[in-house]
């Protein structure tokens, strides 16, 4: 489908605006994946706060120019599906990783987080980041365990002091 200049400018403007507010980005190749499966992926992406779009590589290079995602430029080869995580840095990576397990033809190319390029082989680094709620829960569990341990040690010290007296 041929795009005129106004269409291209609109696409670049829209995706650039999304990129400004994104926490991370993941690039994938979806050749060979059925339309039904892609529709499921897009639906799951909307629910997870992930913006997805298939964009021409030349337009994507313009979009990422001067942003924290500029390191992805070399990954823009062949059909490119880009996903921006809007709410949680690992959301798009987690979504693509799970989708790639179920669909062998779906290939994750690379990801970017805070200006760092993450190759597809290391996508788990980004996908396994805990959500905000999970991180708070882990912190609270650690604090609770520490205070319980302190209480046990204090009671043991009191018991030892009473036995010694």
Swiss-Prot record:
Name of the molecule in the record: Large ribosomal subunit protein uL10
Q: Which gene encodes it?
A: rplJ
- Assembly description: Part of the ribosomal stalk of the 50S ribosomal subunit. The N-terminus interacts with L11 and the large rRNA to form the base of the stalk. The C-terminus forms an elongated spine to which L12 dimers bind in a sequential fashion forming a multimeric L10(L12)X complex.
Per the UniProt record, the source organism is Enterobacter sp. (strain 638)
Asked whether the UniProt record includes Aminoacyl-tRNA synthetase among its keywords, one would answer no
- Enumerate the UniProt keywords alphabetically: Ribonucleoprotein, Ribosomal protein, RNA-binding, rRNA-binding
Q: A Gene Ontology molecular-function term?
A: structural constituent of ribosome
For the biological process aspect of GO, one term held by this record is:
translation
- NCBIfam families (UniProt xref): PRK00099.1-1 (NF000955)
Record's keyword annotation contains Ribonucleoprotein: yes
Please give the InterPro entries that the UniProt record associates with this protein. Answer: Ribosomal_uL10, Ribosomal_uL10-like_sf, Ribosomal_uL10_bac, Ribosomal_uL10_bac_type, Ribosomal_uL10_CS_bac
Relate the protein's function as given in its record: Forms part of the ribosomal stalk, playing a central role in the interaction of the ribosome with GTP-bound translation factors.
One term under GO cellular component: large ribosomal subunit
Family matches, as Gene3D superfamilies: 3.30.70.1730, 6.10.250.2350
